[in-house]
Amino acid sequence: MNKQRIYSIVAILLFVVGGVLIGKPFYDGYQAEKKQTENVQAVQKMDYEKHETEFVDASKIDQPDLAEVANASLDKKQVIGRISIPSVSLELPVLKSSTEKNLLSGAATVKENQVMGKGNYALAGHNMSKKGVLFSDIASLKKGDKIYLYDNENEYEYAVTGVSEVTPDKWEVVEDHGKDEITLITCVSVKDNSKRYVVAGDLVGTKAKK
């Protein structure tokens, strides 16, 4: 085999490998979005579990990659509701407690004994730095944007009051503040776990779910 042929084969192999490396993140992102859509469709008309939430320290959970999100299996026994944010086209299951497994499939509760529409309803979600996947888009929310929670009986409507950036030790953001509100928390990026984006919103209405 002459040198020219060897060079050609090596060049082709490098091209193929390069294409795979470049294309894999896009493929994983597509699969993650597809899995998320399937999860939402699966929970939209199901009977949700009771609000029996527990505290799990999510700060000790490693940041997953898109392939892990795409391959995660939704545990329907953990689903207690659904969250919808129309302004960023977000639709996710709400799962009880921020376990590693639950955070791969949707938004997860942060505190013990959380009840939708009462006190500070806090939810955590991964920022995958990929539009349309989990909590990647919540930092772009604006004051007045609507957030909707759903359980078996009701739709809870919240209006965003602000978005801030805090360090992970600022647990006061999820504490009750004497009003009915919502708090959404995520890392600032898939590569940066040193700070959190925090979205705050006030409850503006509750009505029976259609």
Curated annotation (Swiss-Prot):
Subcellular location: Cell membrane
Residues passing through the membrane, by range: 6-26
Effect upon mutating I61A: Decreases sortase-mediated cell wall protein anchoring
Protein name: Sortase A
Primary residence: membrane
Superkingdom to which the source organism belongs: Bacteria
UniProt entry keywords in alphabetical sequence: Cell membrane, Hydrolase, Membrane, Protease, Thiol protease, Transmembrane, Transmembrane helix
